[in-house]
Amino acid sequence: MDIQFLGAAGTVTGSKYLVRAGNERLLVDCGLFQGFKPLRLRNWEKPPVDPSAVGAVVLTHAHIDHSGYLPVLVKKGFRGRVYCTEATADLCRILLPDSARLAEEDAERANRHGYSKHHPALPLYTERDAEAALGHLVTVPWGHDFEPVAGLRASFASGSWFSCRRSP
């Protein structure tokens, strides 16, 4: 098993960690980069891992820098499950569509006032993309073991902490 840091390294946003175990790929968190423009531009780059090769995502919590890239991942081909606690799912159902709405409003405003160098300015993702991502959520109770991908066991503990280990 190995882990690759795809975000939140050198910065505190864009949390994404790829766990590889044999042929399986698990993404821990799927966050947006936030802050100065060079960081935000990373959200528009080609995904750091082929979304269709990721078997599952585990969200430690709902903050946008941990969950906000999910609509992009789904739009680009992710078809697996997104495991999280009920509280995280509840918050994602608010945060992801709201984030999309804000991005759509920003793009509309940029187009109306002509201040974007992109013509037309587009949102990173839409409310429809956010709703599609929410369809992948699977809730897991605190302290219960689950197998997000073959060969890996995980469980959520208090706060935003979770454990991941090889299956026996």
Question: What do the PLM-derived regions correspond to, one by one?
Answer:
Residues 21-80, 84-88, 95-131:
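Pre-active-site segment of Zn-dependent metallo-hydrolases
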